[in-house]
Design a protein with these regions (language model features):
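C-terminal binding/interaction regions
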Residues: 2-14, 20-23, 27-28, 33-127
Length: 127
């Protein structure tokens, strides 16, 4: 079975990928993949995504060193969403946090729930 061809991509050829920390199940991020990024991910053993804003393939950690080593890949019953278990090196979030889900709403107030690991300006040259 060639699962890459059996998956259901949207009209832009993309499929969402939920990325969890291996061992804890903590959601680190949600990103988009296409067939090319999925093939590269499986070949490399590290996460490779499709950037909708830049319209290009990007290897997670290629600039920052904050790679995501794949431990497991699953897909849902409709074959239209992927779930990856990864070992995260450094911050998953481009804002410098371990998880992109570093904010919570508590009693109507937004709270930052974890420490920033890196300064994004130093890592990516952005504010």
């Amino acid at each position: 079975m060639n699962i890459i061809d059996e998956l259901k991509y949207d009209s832009n050829g993309l499929i969402p990928a939920v990325v969890q920390e291996h061992g804890t199940g903590r959601v680190l991020m949600v990103a988009w993949m296409n067939k090319e990024s999925l093939v590269k991910t499986l070949a490399l053993g590290e996460m490779v995504y499709w950037s909708r804003s830049r319209k290009e393939i990007w290897h997670k950690g290629g600039t920052s060193g904050h790679t995501q080593k794949v431990k497991d890949m699953a897909f849902d019953c409709d074959k239209d969403c992927l779930l990856f278990q990864v070992v995260q090196a450094g911050a998953a979030c481009h804002d410098g946090y371990k998880s992109c889900f570093y904010r919570s709403v508590v009693n109507g107030d937004v709270k930052v729930t974890e420490p920033r690991l890196v300064d994004p300006e130093k890592v990516y040259g952005k504010k």
